[in-house]
Every structure is written in structure tokens, then in C-alpha cells.
């Protein structure tokens, strides 16, 4: 079921990959184009930066992060331990990615337990 949900994310306009990483377990699941490895190290660094920023009381906890440009990336916290990453190329529609994630986040959380 988790692979099916991730496949749906990777089929979104402009998306190439969707994967879940965990602090404890590393790469949990991944779906994407052949020959393209998930950017686990890059995503982990972003998540760690979000956690450091969240230690500032004025900012609060970061639940989502996205970048747009030649490469697009959406990082969504699923739990304290796990995060979902959707990545792709220029021309992706972050708003559609975010909406799709929002619709399936509860299902993903239940599968992660």
C-alpha cells in the first residue's frame, strides 16, 4: 500500500521520485524513475536544518519545506521520526504535490506505525 501511495506521488506533474526516510531506519521506501537514486543525504541535511531552526522558540517546529528552481523538492514531516520527500524537475506544481500529500498523510502515518 505504501508503494502504491508513493507511486501516485511520483506520477504527479513534474515529480520524478517519492520516498520516505526515517532518522532511525534511513530509507524506508522509494518509488521513482529507473537509474535515479533518492537524494537521502540531501534530504537528511534539510530535515536536520529544519530541526535546528525549530529549536528557536520564535520560529517553532517546521512541518514542511519546499524549494523551486531547476530541481524541485518537497519535504513533509510525517512524524517525529519519518519524513516524506517528493522531488522533480522544473515545471512541477508544488501546490498539487502538497495537496496530494495532505490527502494521503493520515494513511501514510497509519502504515508507518
Predicted segments, located by residue:
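Acidic, low-complexity cytosolic segments
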Residues: 1-17, 23-113
